């Protein structure tokens, strides 16, 4: 689990379609003042885990949570790790994700490596983001939480060049 924990949505029902809205996720931060609003004292400080990731449509929730963490921690937020139903991944010493097991895959959402930018636009405030790096982990892949490096069969993957992307002309 995470020191910073997702504890559901702030509305009364589980609404994944609201996940990209600002403050739609109830978070327990590691630095919370009260026992009931603080994440676990053990667990990852480099990742925020979200369970049933694909099954319950939680990509938007994870994106907005990591954007909020980016703001909260001054641009040095943790990665989001989306683990699907009946799937698991080993977190070794809060440094390495490896040894995926189960029925599906794991997504890693990273705002820092490509210097993602984001803002909350419209009413209700909805996340708009650019340069968010997403890795999909399957058997034989690892993710170094310290270096923010994805590897397949022990070979690091090249970090994409985000400057090559341009806004489409309409």
How would you label these PLM feature ranges?
Residues 1-3:
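Beta-edge loop/turn motif
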Residues 5, 10-170:
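C-terminal and late-domain segments of enzyme folds
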């Amino acid at each position: 689990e995470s020191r910073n924990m997702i504890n559901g949505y702030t509305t009364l029902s589980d609404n994944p379609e609201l996940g990209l809205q600002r403050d739609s996720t109830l978070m327990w931060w590691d630095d919370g003042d009260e026992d009931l609003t603080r994440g676990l004292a053990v667990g990852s400080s480099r990742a925020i885990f979200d369970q049933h990731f694909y099954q319950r449509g939680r990509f938007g929730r994870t994106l907005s949570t990591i954007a909020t963490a980016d703001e909260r921690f001054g641009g040095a937020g943790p990665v989001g790790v989306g683990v699907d139903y009946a799937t698991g991944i080993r977190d070794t010493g809060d440094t390495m994700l490896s040894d995926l097991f189960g029925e599906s895959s794991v997504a890693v959402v990273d705002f820092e490596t490509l210097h993602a930018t984001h803002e909350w636009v419209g009413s209700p405030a909805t996340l708009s983001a650019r340069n968010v790096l997403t890795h999909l982990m399957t058997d034989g892949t690892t993710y170094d939480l310290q270096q923010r490096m994805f590897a397949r069969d022990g070979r690091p993957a090249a970090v994409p060049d985000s400057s090559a992307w341009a806004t489409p002309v309409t």
